[in-house]
């Protein structure tokens, strides 16, 4: 890939999340001559407007790319080592990019939380990506980096202390402050629409192992109704991102040769508190649609709202002797926009700059980048990975 003009192309640079990625690249790497990057989108005029509004150097190239024109996409893909795309829903706008990256040995990162589409892309392009050396990494935003890397971080500690992994981990969202992503809501709508055309996707969405290359593990703990978590002494509610996060965690386990074990169980829920108040809150959360008030795609919260947001996720490893080891992952901005834009930018740079020995294939964040990405996220992106008593 030494003949590529750029390390990273930010595709979707004129969209709301794309602009946040551009702003982060400018602030974090604008003076770093070892990283070359470009902005790409459908409208040259809008690219100029974003560049000038953010004060991006005119040395940063602007690439006009038509998402409906495969030759236009191929031209972009062949100029860069990695395509960072924020243009979703990916089942509508991502297929040609994945296809071209897999064919041309170009790395790829996205914010995808669409398991049906991911399942199709794995089946169609994973083998070619292995042949060409393309490293394609889905879900490099709030879904699913804090969860995928949180489980990975905790399992590494469990193995260091006990010599073997925990067979059961509970993910528990303790805090999540900030607006939900309009892109997430649009992706959910697109997924619902695709089910009408492809009813076979129901099985993919319902199966926690549907991204696990044919492996079927043990029955997983139910997560679709409020329950009382006896060990934490709190009520927990269904977490709307669990369907994608759990699939990615199980895929990571497969890609790392069952590092967590073939009997591994993982479920993910949202802490609501103890007592009758906690029960009522859990039942309310379980009955609501958290994405109903999400911004429209292309829109998003104010800078103040993003900076005042945060999140905190607890991970509990239940060991055979009855003891539990806890770890937590937290972020310093709202999950859907501020933190997500930093996570995907660091993922792209980590992949290109720090993973020369990673072979081609379709990955989740943990097996692709592991400790290297954790270190970057802690150093640069406001995430904290820690053990707790």
PLM regions: where:
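Rossmann-fold NAD(P)-binding glycine/threonine-rich loop
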Residues: 112-134
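C-terminal catalytic/substrate-binding lobe primarily of soluble NAD(P)-dependent oxidoreductases
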Residues: 18, 131, 156-389
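Conserved Rossmann-fold cofactor-binding substructure of NAD(P)-dependent oxidoreductases
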Residues: 64-80, 86-92
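Short, conserved SAM-binding/catalytic segment
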Residues: 50-57
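N-terminal Rossmann NAD(P)H-binding glycine-rich loop of SDR-like oxidoreductase domains
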Residues: 6-27
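ADP-ribose/adenylate-binding Rossmann-like module
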Residues: 89, 100-118
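Conserved glycine-rich Rossmann-like NAD(P)H-binding loop of the short-chain dehydrogenase/reductase
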Residues: 30-46
């Amino acid at each position: 890939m030494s003949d590529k003009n750029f390390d990273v192309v930010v595709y979707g640079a004129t969209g709301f999340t794309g602009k946040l990625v551009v702003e982060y690249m400018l602030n974090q790497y604008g003076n770093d001559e070892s990283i070359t990057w470009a902005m790409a989108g459908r409208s040259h005029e809008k690219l100029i407007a974003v560049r000038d509004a953010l004060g991006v150097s005119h040395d940063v190239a602007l690439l006009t790319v038509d998402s409906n024109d495969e030759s236009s996409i191929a031209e972009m893909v062949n100029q860069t080592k990695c395509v960072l795309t924020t243009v979703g829903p990916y089942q509508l706008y991502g297929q040609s990019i994945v296809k071209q990256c897999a064919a041309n040995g170009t790395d790829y990162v996205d914010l995808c939380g669409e398991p049906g589409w991911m399942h199709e892309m794995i089946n169609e392009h994973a083998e070619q990506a292995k042949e060409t050396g393309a490293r394609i990494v889905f879900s490099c935003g709030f879904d699913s980096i804090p969860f995928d890397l949180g489980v990975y971080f905790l399992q590494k500690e469990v193995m260091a202390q006990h010599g073997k992994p925990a067979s059961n981990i509970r993910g528990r969202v303790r805090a999540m402050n900030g607006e939900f992503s309009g892109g997430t809501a649009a992706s959910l709508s697109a997924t619902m629409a695709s089910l009408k055309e492809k009813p076979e996707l129901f099985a993919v969405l319902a199966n926690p192992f549907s991204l696990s290359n044919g492996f079927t593990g043990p029955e997983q703990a139910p997560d679709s109704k409020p329950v009382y978590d006896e060990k934490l002494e709190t009520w927990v509610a269904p977490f709307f991102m669990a369907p994608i996060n759990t699939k990615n965690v199980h895929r990571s386990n497969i890609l790392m040769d069952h590092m967590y074990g073939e009997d591994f169980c993982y479920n993910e829920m949202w802490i609501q508190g103890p007592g009758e108040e906690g029960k009522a809150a859990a039942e309310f959360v379980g009955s609501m649609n958290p994405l109903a008030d999400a911004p429209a795609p292309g829109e998003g919260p104010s800078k103040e709202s993003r900076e005042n947001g945060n999140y905190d996720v607890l991970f509990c490893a239940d060991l055979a002797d009855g003891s539990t080891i806890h770890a937590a992952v937290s972020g310093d901005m709202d999950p859907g926009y501020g933190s997500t834009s930093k996570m995907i930018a660091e993922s792209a740079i980590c992949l290109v700059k720090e993973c020369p020995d990673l072979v081609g294939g379709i990955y989740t964040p943990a097996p692709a980048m592991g400790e290297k990405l954790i270190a970057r996220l802690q150093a640069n992106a406001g995430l904290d990975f820690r053990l707790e008593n």
